[in-house]
Design a protein with these regions (language model features):
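Active-site segments that bind and position negatively charged phosphate/pyrophosphate groups
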Residues: 1-65
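C-terminal charged capping/lid subdomain of soluble metabolic enzymes
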Residues: 36, 40-42, 46-121
């Protein structure tokens, strides 16, 4: 999903990854809750005794806080506007890249469109 943001809006790949990370992580958790809970514990954002669900919630919360602390902008705050047609095109391009298939929860085109809409704000 990062590549289309960079290609259409000239956003650096790492920055587009940062823009997407909290929302895509939140979406992906149901695909492997244990793995994401392990990440939260490794980052010291969750305790060993926390349930996977609680640890995952803390992970997502802290990813949003980290983005706030680092002042990671949204595409919209950078002045980039996109409409449903652009989101559809970007979703098709993201799927064509093959990258979404590496996600623990493989998104559909409509789910990718929705994620872009949410990231845009």
């Amino acid at each position: 999903m990062s590549r289309p943001i960079g290609a259409h809006f000239h956003v650096a790949h790492g920055l587009s990854n940062a823009m997407l990370l909290p929302k895509v992580t939140e979406f992906s958790i149901e695909g492997n809750q244990e793995r994401y809970a392990t990440c939260a514990r490794a980052m010291k954002w969750a305790k060993e005794k926390d349930s996977h669900e609680v640890a995952c919630s803390k992970l997502v919360e802290n990813l949003y806080l980290l983005n706030d602390d680092l002042k990671v902008p949204s595409p919209k705050s950078l002045g980039h506007s996109a409409d449903k047609d652009m989101f559809r095109l970007m979703a098709s391009q993201a799927l064509a890249s093959g990258s979404p298939q590496n996600n623990p929860r493989v998104p559909t085109k409509n789910q990718i469109i929705h994620l872009y809409e949410e990231v845009w704000g």
